[in-house]
Amino acid sequence: MTWFIDRRLNGKNKSAVNRQRFLRRYKAQIKQSISEAINKRSVTDIESGESVSIPTDDINEPMFHQGRGGLRNRVHPGNDHFVQNDRIERPQGGGGGGGGDQGQASADGEGKDEFVFQISKDEYLDLLFEDLALPNLKKNQHRQLNEFKTHRAGFTSNGVPANISVVRSLQNSLARRTAMTAGKRRELRALEEDLETISRSEPVQLLEEERLRKEIAELRAKIERVPFIDTFDLRYKNYEKRPEPSSQAVMFCLMDVSGSMDQATKDMAKRFYILLYLFLSRTYKNVDVVYIRHHTQAKEVDEHEFFYSQETGGTIVSSALKLMDEVVQARYDPAQWNIYAAQASDGDNWADDSPLCHELLAKKILPVVRYYSYIEITRRAHQTLWREYEHLQATFDNFAMQHIRDQEDIYPVFRELFHKQSSKSEA
């Protein structure tokens, strides 16, 4: 009786190759499903991955079949209704009118359930932040921010099926079989030579010839029992993450918490900043994040207070810009740091303060930052702050602004602001 023993280390993940191939083939549909799903749950809920649904029509495989219409000869085996040369009437309706009369709940229309499967946390985040990067990142420092890229690093004896090296594994198999059977093959050749000598000698030595044939058969059986391939032979392509030359970076998060920001607007702003935080922590190892909340006064806070504090008040946006400028001058030398900022507001500001915001950005902040993004979250018409910022966008290439009306706009706006651009790094 033959027993098969599965000694693979990844025996519980035997379909890994097919899974990776499926994710690559239907990446566009999966990313579309993820962009829709992210608006239906908290972006911090990532531990369980995501259930992704794909329309069944998108995963149909091509198939060959005979076209409708025309004349053709067919053989119907085993029928008891027709004999040779009988004519069979053509079915009515040329469009494949099958289906029967079952399912009378609806007079017309048909469909199929969508294909639903689960992706892991890592797969979810990889697809969520694919092709995103901090714009204009200057490669001039090597101390804090470590960005890693994957490189080939030889072969390893452990790995996943997707990384198996067939050529190297077969080479190892050949070397092992050669080493394990070399002595037996030498002995086999010697016995075959003895057998040939005895068979030609006179008189015929039947007993000796029989013994030699038996030993030869036993040796051949032993050689054939050496397995063609063993887990010892398997080699996998090895990859390692190497730090790439990169620079120190700091992200300023400026959030308006004034009384004009209702709870729904604040929640959308927080969702945007949570996305930003996940993106930075996923893509870069070390990035400083400075959190600033403002109403009539601005205050630098920690992460918990930034997201959960209930403090509110009037609206003077320039207070946050002044505080950011002070922090930059005190802690972040523009010659040593890549400085980024993301500002979220409903656009409601004291009218006389908006020109001051324009002046602060144009003269102090934009000349020293790599990228400044402004997100206005409102369903109302734009006010003076937006119009002042429009002048900045026309003048500065490192200033971007986007408008969020509903929760569904958050992820598309985020991707638009941080999509990966062509490399323009300065020396």
UniProtKB/Swiss-Prot annotation:
Coiled coil: none annotated. InterPro entries: UPF0229 (IPR006698). It comes from the Bacteria. It holds the Pfam family DUF444. Residues 92-102 have a biased composition (Gly residues). Residues 72-109 are annotated as: Disordered. Residues 77-90 have a biased composition (Basic and acidic residues). PANTHER family: UPF0229 PROTEIN YEAH (PTHR30510:SF2). Belongs to the UPF0229 family. This is UPF0229 protein KPK_3252. It comes from Klebsiella pneumoniae (strain 342).
